[in-house]
């Protein structure tokens, strides 16, 4: 087997490389994500959740990812630098995976998002008028600083800071939530990921997972992609979710 190790800082890379070689895995190191990662049997990400999101932005077909958390919360990761060897050995030997949906956005056809698509005002501190449609049905029109269309995985990201609910990672859904809405009592919507979401706004930018962005005026469509993010199975993912959420901040 061949593994790509993608690292933000190289403090633990030597140990990870040696551990993989003991498992008879060929290793190639990358200090930046690359489209080449699609050609490997699996990927080891060394960093935080942001490192994994940057890796995913480069991939359409996604080999299984094993995350070693050197960041803060590490909701997407499997192990820490202190305990990764046991967990990595177990993952490689069992090779059980789990898939989480990513979403596509018509404004950025070459980019897929795992966490969210955010629509923001192009001008800082200036509100925009947003219209929201679900399967062609207008749900609302609202003035706000922006609007987030998040996945269940993204419920603990930007949507969380905007007041959205925490959703368990295996419940596939869209969370629709405005940023700083100019209205009393606005509540998020949670809808099936089989729905088609349309957001209409002017003088806006659209951002995928806090990484890539483009300007747009008019309408964008957000839908579930046929290319999921693939991770090694993490049996503690649900069990650890709420403790990690409590640790945020």
Curated annotation (Swiss-Prot):
Disulfide bonds: none annotated. It is an enzyme of class 2 (transferase). Its cofactor is a divalent metal cation. GO terms for biological process: NAD metabolic process; NADP biosynthetic process. It catalyses: NAD(+) + ATP = ADP + NADP(+) + H(+). Keywords: ATP-binding, Cytoplasm, Kinase, NAD, NADP, Nucleotide-binding, Transferase. It is found in: Cytoplasm. The active site is at residue 49. SUPFAM superfamilies: NAD kinase/diacylglycerol kinase-like. GO terms for cellular component: cytoplasm. Its EC number is 2.7.1.23. InterPro entries: ATP-NAD_kinase_N, ATP-NAD_kinase_PpnK-typ_C, NAD/diacylglycerol_kinase_sf, NADK. GO terms for molecular function: ATP binding; metal ion binding; NAD binding; NAD+ kinase activity. NAD(+) binds at residues 49-50, 54, 115-116, 126, 143, 145, 153, 156-161, 180, 211. Homotetramer. Belongs to the NAD kinase family. HAMAP family: NAD_kinase. Involved in the regulation of the intracellular balance between NAD(H) and NADP(H), and is a key enzyme in the biosynthesis of NADP. Catalyzes specifically the phosphorylation on 2'-hydroxyl of the adenosine moiety of NAD to yield NADP. This is NAD kinase. It comes from Archaeoglobus fulgidus (strain ATCC 49558 / DSM 4304 / JCM 9628 / NBRC 100126 / VC-16).
């Amino acid at each position: 087997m061949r593994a790509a190790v993608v690292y933000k800082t190289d403090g633990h890379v030597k140990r990870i490389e040696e551990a993989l070689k003991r498992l008879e895995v060929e290793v190639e190191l990358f200090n930046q994500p690359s489209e080449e990662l699609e050609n490997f049997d699996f990927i080891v990400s060394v960093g935080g959740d942001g490192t994994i999101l940057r890796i995913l932005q480069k991939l359409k077909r996604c080999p299984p990812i094993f995350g070693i958390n050197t960041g803060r919360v590490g909701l997407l990761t499997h192990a820490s630098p202190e305990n990764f060897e046991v967990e990595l050995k177990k993952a490689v030997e069992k090779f059980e995976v789990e898939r989480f949906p990513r979403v596509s956005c018509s404004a950025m056809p070459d980019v897929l998002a795992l966490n969210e698509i955010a629509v923001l005002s192009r001008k800082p501190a200036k509100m925009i008028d947003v219209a929201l449609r679900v399967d062609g049905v207008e749900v609302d029109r609202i003035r706000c600083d922006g609007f987030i269309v998040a996945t269940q995985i993204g419920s603990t990201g930007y949507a969380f800071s905007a007041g959205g609910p925490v959703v368990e990672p295996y419940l596939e859904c869209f969370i629709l939530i405005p940023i700083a809405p100019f209205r009393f009592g606005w509540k998020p919507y949670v809808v099936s990921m089989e729905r088609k979401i349309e957001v209409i706004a002017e003088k806006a930018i659209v951002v995928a997972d806090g990484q890539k962005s483009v300007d747009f005026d008019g309408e964008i469509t957000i839908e579930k992609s046929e290319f999921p993010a693939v991770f090694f199975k993490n049996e503690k993912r649900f069990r650890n979710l709420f403790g990690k959420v409590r640790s945020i901040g």
